[in-house]
Amino acid sequence: MQSRNLWRILGLCLLSVGAWGQDEDFKASDDLTSISPEKRFKVSISGTEVVVTCPDVFGYDNIKWEKNDNLVEGASNRELSQKEFSEVDDSGYYACYADSIKEKSYLYLRARVCANCIEVNLMAVVTIIVADICLTLGLLLMVYYWSKTRKANAKPVMRGTGAGSRPRGQNKEKPPPVPNPDYEPIRKGQQDLYSGLNQRGI
């Protein structure tokens, strides 16, 4: 009974922690939604390639990029593409601005990339796990019912009462062994050579 109450208390604690974490997430998301969509950066990751798109405020004319306050050479589009992104070398503060507007928009970028990663959404993972559990349970039920029907159809094996076997009821009491004629017992009344033990004086 105490373990049941312990599980209830643990469940309530987990629910309260989850609700508290959701409040923090809502506060953070409120801060993000206060930024207008045209002032947000867009980041897309595919394999080892990372593409950062400058906000729509600056338009499309001659956009320059800076990384950690250093000008990025050869980047004049709204999209900054890095084919072989490295978390150690390429992470940092990125800024984009147009020549006509000197105001800069900053983004701190730190991304983990891998060459052989596959992006999987949550519904696909849940579907795979549920299908695997259902398939395993189905196989277990099939094996259980198959073994149950096989055991019910099997006939009990009876030992035949042949020359070398006895019925099970006679195994409880064994008859005394028959004396062997090669080894007769010593008779006290006879005086034969081997009828007694000779004791020699030393």
Swiss-Prot record:
It comes from Canis lupus familiaris (Dog). Residues 192-202 have a biased composition (Polar residues). Phosphorylated on Tyr residues after T-cell receptor triggering by LCK in association with CD4/CD8. Residues 1-21 form the signal peptide. The chain crosses the membrane at residues 123-143. Residues 173-200 form the ITAM domain. CDD domains: IgC1_CD3_epsilon (cd07692). Residues 144-202 are cytoplasmic. The keyword Hydrolase does not apply. One of its GO terms (cellular component) is alpha-beta T cell receptor complex. Residues 170-187 are annotated as: NUMB-binding region. Residues 174-181 are annotated as: Proline-rich sequence. Keywords: Adaptive immunity, Cell membrane, Disulfide bond, Immunity, Immunoglobulin domain, Membrane, Phosphoprotein, Receptor, Signal, Transmembrane, Transmembrane helix. The TCR-CD3 complex is composed of a CD3D/CD3E and a CD3G/CD3E heterodimers that preferentially associate with TCRalpha and TCRbeta, respectively, to form TCRalpha/CD3E/CD3G and TCRbeta/CD3G/CD3E trimers. In turn, the hexamer interacts with CD3Z homodimer to form the TCR-CD3 complex. Alternatively, TCRalpha and TCRbeta can be replaced by TCRgamma and TCRdelta. Interacts with CD6. Interacts (via Proline-rich sequence) with NCK1; the interaction is ligand dependent but independent of tyrosine kinase activation. It is found in: Cell membrane. InterPro entries: CD3_esu/gsu/dsu, Ig-like_dom, Ig-like_fold, Ig_sub2, Phos_immunorcpt_sig_ITAM. Part of the TCR-CD3 complex present on T-lymphocyte cell surface that plays an essential role in adaptive immune response. When antigen presenting cells (APCs) activate T-cell receptor (TCR), TCR-mediated signals are transmitted across the cell membrane by the CD3 chains CD3D, CD3E, CD3G and CD3Z. All CD3 chains contain immunoreceptor tyrosine-based activation motifs (ITAMs) in their cytoplasmic domain. Upon TCR engagement, these motifs become phosphorylated by Src family protein tyrosine kinases LCK and FYN, resulting in the activation of downstream signaling pathways. GO terms for molecular function: transmembrane signaling receptor activity. GO terms for biological process: adaptive immune response; cell surface receptor signaling pathway; positive thymic T cell selection. Residues 156-202 are annotated as: Disordered. Residues 37-107 form the Ig-like domain. SMART domains: IGc2, ITAM. This is T-cell surface glycoprotein CD3 epsilon chain. It comes from the Eukaryota. It holds the Pfam family ITAM.
